Amino acid sequence: PIAGSMVLAAILLKLGGYGIIRMMQILPTTKTDMFLPFVVLALWGAILANLTCLQQTDLKSLIAYSSISHMGLVVAAIIIQTPWGLSGAMALMIAHGFTSSALFCLANTTYERTHTRILILTRGLHNILPMATTWWLLTNLMNIAVPPTMNFTGELLIMSALFNWCPTTIIMLGLSMLITASYSLHMFLSTQMGPTLLNNQTEPTHSREHLLMILHLIPLMMISMKPELVI
């Protein structure tokens, strides 16, 4: 069910990150040699989740693995125990909570009309649902973390903190973000572009669906303008 997916991605997955923040407070202060294997493991996990996203054919599976890959960055940022790392982790958790929930909502909008979640079978929707295509584009851009969204703020803080802590981590971070951009654009092009395969009549998007998307995306824009609310 769509509500379960949205709550799972937006809240329950982030509770794990919050638990790690609490647990790190009782551990000894950070030493590069001690925590480096865990940071590398978290970033490697993020890269593997991103690569898994690239080979997904199911829309909901792709979005779910996307959430897991972002949590890899969050865990790496929490482990190093720096103020910038913790701020970036908190910002990215909140931002990606909104983004992944919005993506699941859009996936359900597509599923209700096509009755399939296979990427290649849902293509050509920009001709039928142009407004939904706009929402897909905006949400994917937020998933990639373009400014001025909260995702950008979070990823910038995490990149700065990790690079300052250990410069070689930038290789894995850069690779992870490159693959994130690749699968996000792949998801957008697969679902929206090309000739449509639908023969039956498709109902237009409802005001309820547009309101849902507005309520997801507006907070992301607003919080990025005043990040003190969450950081």
From Swiss-Prot:
It is found in: Mitochondrion membrane. GO terms for molecular function: NADH dehydrogenase (ubiquinone) activity; ubiquinone binding. Keywords: Electron transport, Membrane, Mitochondrion, NAD, Respiratory chain, Translocase, Transmembrane, Transmembrane helix, Transport, Ubiquinone. Its EC number is 7.1.1.2. It is a multi-pass membrane protein. One of its GO terms (biological process) is electron transport coupled proton transport. It catalyses: a ubiquinone + NADH + 5 H(+)(in) = a ubiquinol + NAD(+) + 4 H(+)(out). GO terms for cellular component: mitochondrial membrane. The chain crosses the membrane at residues 1-21, 34-54, 63-85, 89-111, 128-148, 156-176. Pfam families: Proton_antipo_M (PF00361). Its main location: mitochondrion. Core subunit of the mitochondrial membrane respiratory chain NADH dehydrogenase (Complex I) that is believed to belong to the minimal assembly required for catalysis. Complex I functions in the transfer of electrons from NADH to the respiratory chain. The immediate electron acceptor for the enzyme is believed to be ubiquinone. PANTHER family: NADH-UBIQUINONE OXIDOREDUCTASE CHAIN 4 (PTHR43507:SF20). Belongs to the complex I subunit 4 family. This is NADH-ubiquinone oxidoreductase chain 4. The lineage of its organism: Eukaryota, Metazoa, Chordata, Craniata, Vertebrata.
